[in-house]
Amino acid sequence: MIDKQKTIQTYAKSANDTGSTAVQVALLTERINNLSRHLTENKKDKHGQRGLQLLNGQRRRLLKYLERTNYDEYIALTDRLGIRRGQRIVR
C-alpha cells in the first residue's frame, strides 16, 4: 500500500508542497511499482495492464516537462527514484 504522506514529505520542497512535479512523479512511481507487483501475481488482469500503461504515460509526460524546465532536478529525481533516463534531445 502507498504511504502518500510519507512520499510527499520525502520529495516536497517545502512543508506545504504537495503538487510540484517531483512530488507528482514520486507518487506516480509508487503507484506504478504497486501495480507492477500486483500484475506479476495476476497476469490476466488486462484492466490493470491498461492502467499501468496510462500511469507510465502520465509519469513520462511529467518527466519530460521536468527535463525541459529544470534539468538538474530531473537528473536528481530520476537517480533517487531509480528511473531510467532517455537521451537528452537539445533543440
Swiss-Prot record:
Sorted UniProt keywords: Ribonucleoprotein, Ribosomal protein, RNA-binding, rRNA-binding
Lineage: superkingdom: Bacteria
GO terms, molecular function: rRNA binding; structural constituent of ribosome
Pfam family, one: Ribosomal_S15
SUPFAM superfamilies: S15/NS1 RNA-binding domain (SSF47060)
Alphabetical GO biological process terms: translation
One of the record's GO cellular component terms: cytosolic small ribosomal subunit
Stated family: Belongs to the universal ribosomal protein uS15 family.
Subunit relationships: Part of the 30S ribosomal subunit. Forms a bridge to the 50S subunit in the 70S ribosome, contacting the 23S rRNA.
Role noted for this protein: One of the primary rRNA binding proteins, it binds directly to 16S rRNA where it helps nucleate assembly of the platform of the 30S subunit by binding and bridging several RNA helices of the 16S rRNA.
NCBIfam families in the cross-refs: S15_bact (TIGR00952)
Protein name (Swiss-Prot/TrEMBL): Small ribosomal subunit protein uS15
Lineage: Bacteria, Thermotogati, Deinococcota, Deinococci, Deinococcales
Primary gene name: rpsO
